[in-house]
Amino acid sequence: MLHKFLIAVAVLFSACALYAQKSVSSAVSDIEDDPSNGLEMCRSLFNEYFLSELTTHEKVNMLDTKTVQKALSDLDLSRGRNLTEKEIKNLCAKLKTDALCLVKMSRGAKNAIVITVRIVDNKGKEVGKVTASMKGIGDTDATSHSMARDCAVILRKIRGIVPPKPLAP
């Protein structure tokens, strides 16, 4: 009898803990990227793949591109420069998100495409940065997958959700 009671209590506490862990919400934008660097198509493709990876595979609550673009337009933010802390706060408030994933692309050595995702919280503070390089547009899927996985870990830490450590062999 006591055993059944303890199991019921454990299940109740587990359910409460899961309910209390509100997931992180975020948005992806390339507002800070230089619009004249010739990578528009690649950037657009990467953003959609990256957004899909975060939403589908990493289970992060992400806003759709149209909502983000409307908020950027409403706030009259100009492209190609780093957002200020105040602008980030205002954008997060308008979008009702915990964080932003700000994507930048550039050409690196041997014409590689270097992607940097800067993650900022809704207070405007940078909480992490993930960088990767791809040889061409054909690497978009694999690169977006690995970057989304790394960014999801950083995004979850904003809410205090830390991934479990792997068991020792």
Q: What function would you assign to each model-found segment?
A:
Residues 31-34, 60, 65-68, 105-108, ...:
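Solvent-exposed coil/turn segments that connect beta secondary-structure elements
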Residues 25-37, 72-73:
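Acidic/histidine-rich, surface-exposed loop or edge segments in extracytoplasmic proteins
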Residues 13-20:
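Sec/Tat signal peptide C-region and signal peptidase I cleavage site
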Residues 115:
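Beta-strand acidic-aromatic groove motif in beta-rich domains, primarily in extracellular
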Residues 37-46:
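Glycine- and acidic-residue-enriched helix-capping/strand-helix junction motifs
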Residues 57-102, 108-111:
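Short, solvent-exposed, polar/charged sequence segments at loop or secondary-structure edges
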Residues 1-5:
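Positively charged n-region of N-terminal signal peptides that target proteins for export
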Residues 21-27, 46-47, 53, 57, ...:
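C-terminal/domain-edge helix-coil "capping" segments
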